[in-house]
């Protein structure tokens, strides 16, 4: 009703007003930001296991031990204020300086799949850039999200920062997310989630950093180290039960080495479905599937569930040690073309690497998100990287390497492919300001 909408708007306005009072934070300098970020990292380390287990209990998704790894990754490898860069030009006409400035208030939307990791990551990046943040968490993860934000605020005040620099909507809904995204007090949106929430953010007139879905393909050619490929594909695709958008979702393997790849996947924790078992899996996890090269409709009950539980549901016993369900399927099978977000990995045989790359580009659906290849041929790496045009491209490792887990570089849990920022970082959440001093400050 209009009364409920008005009340919701007033409540959010009061919260934003509280944040506005903290904008003195913008005057506190970089040293305080460094201190705050360091203290946030310390407190999050202390509560890492607690938050991981709480997220697992509340959402019912993924694996608690993998959530510990996710949280540890963002705690340690999200960039801080050191990511901000200034530029200076001097010449006969004086000096010009550009500096990264805060936007003010960030309106952030976070998913149920990675609730604490996304909040920690977004907070470190946003505060490093000098911003305040208002979160609208996923309703299915509201308790752990509120608890995480309380701990973060305690860390901020411990470091000498203002109280309630980071706040959240206490009872998040789709409607409260829409209110936040359209509120005049919010200067920039940071949205991490599925296609629905990304499209809602596109409808606003605000600057938006939008991290949407993906369907990351893997290509394995005849030159690949097949033991490495099998091990890394299982490691990546089974991580937190395939909840991360960067996790591997389908494999295209050159037919001459397909059997050896499947053997390696089984040796490293996979369970290869028999033909009769594949039909049972389809009926379990799909509510609708055409197997004509189009996406299926997924039964949400099985999203983020353990491979052993999925196998038990089709009558496979004593499979609790299996991390990944592996399905040998034709290229038009709906598993290939669907972002399942569960540990079920379709593997399709193709005649050569050219066909594998062609299909990988199609299966990625133009999300420009993530892809990977296993090959010893540098030309294949180069060609696929160019043709698939994704934000994260990984060669010869699990796609987790692209997030800094098993690879170099910083991490982010907001991969903004739709809007082009890629891995979101503090400089993504700042605006450039320029100072020009004509005829002065030139010392040579």
Model-derived segments and spans:
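Conserved C-terminal structural/oligomerization subdomain of aldehyde/semialdehyde dehydrogenase
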Residues: 316-444
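ALDH superfamily catalytic-core signature
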Residues: 120, 147, 198-325, 330-331
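Rossmann-like NAD(P) dinucleotide-binding subdomain of oxidoreductase/dehydrogenase enzymes
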Residues: 86-228
């Amino acid at each position: 009703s209009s009364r409920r909408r008005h009340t919701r708007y007033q409540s959010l306005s009061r919260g934003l007003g509280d944040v506005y009072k903290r904008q003195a934070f913008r005057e506190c300098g970089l040293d305080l930001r460094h201190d705050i970020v360091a203290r946030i990292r310390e407190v999050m380390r202390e509560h890492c296991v607690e938050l991981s287990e709480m997220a697992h209990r509340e959402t019912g998704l993924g694996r608690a031990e993998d959530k510990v790894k996710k949280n540890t990754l963002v705690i340690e490898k999200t960039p801080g204020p050191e990511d901000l860069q200034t530029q200076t030009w001097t010449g006969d006409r004086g000096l010009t300086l550009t500096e990264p400035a805060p936007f003010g208030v960030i309106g952030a939307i976070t998913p149920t799949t990675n609730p604490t990791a996304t909040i920690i990551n977004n907070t470190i990046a946003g505060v490093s850039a000098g911003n305040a943040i208002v979160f609208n968490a996923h309703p299915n993860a509201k308790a752990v999200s509120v608890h995480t934000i309380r701990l973060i605020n305690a860390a901020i005040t411990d470091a000498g920062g203002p109280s309630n620099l980071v706040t959240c909507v206490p009872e998040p809904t789709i409607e409260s997310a829409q209110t936040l995204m359209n509120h005049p007090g919010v200067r920039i949106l940071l949205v991490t989630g599925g296609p629905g929430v990304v499209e809602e953010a596109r409808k606003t007139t605000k600057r938006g950093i939008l991290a949407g879905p993906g369907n990351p393909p893997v290509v394995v050619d005849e030159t690949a180290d097949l033991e490495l490929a099998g091990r890394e594909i299982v490691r990546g695709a089974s991580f937190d039960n395939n909840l991360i958008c960067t996790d591997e979702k389908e494999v295209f393997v050159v037919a001459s080495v397909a059997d050896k790849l499947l053997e390696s996947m089984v040796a490293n924790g996979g369970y290869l479905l028999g033909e009769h078992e594949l039909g049972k899996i389809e009926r379990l996890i799909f509510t609708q599937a055409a197997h004509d090269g189009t996406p299926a409709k997924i039964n949400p009950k099985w999203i983020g569930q353990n491979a052993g539980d999925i196998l038990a549901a089709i009558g496979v016993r004593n499979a609790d040690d299996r991390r990944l369900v592996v399905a040998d399927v034709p290229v038009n099978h709906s598993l290939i073309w669907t972002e399942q977000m569960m540990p079920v990995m379709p593997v399709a045989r193709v005649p050569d690497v050219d066909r594998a790359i062609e299909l990988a580009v199609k299966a990625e659906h133009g999300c420009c998100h993530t892809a990977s290849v296993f090959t010893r041929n540098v030309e294949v790496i180069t060609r696929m990287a160019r043709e698939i045009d994704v934000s994260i491209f990984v060669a010869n490792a699990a796609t987790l390497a692209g997030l800094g887990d098993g690879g170099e570089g910083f991490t982010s849990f907001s991969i903004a492919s739709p809007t082009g920022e890629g891995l979101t970082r503090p400089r993504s959440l700042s605006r450039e300001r320029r100072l020009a001093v004509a005829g002065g400050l030139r010392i040579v």
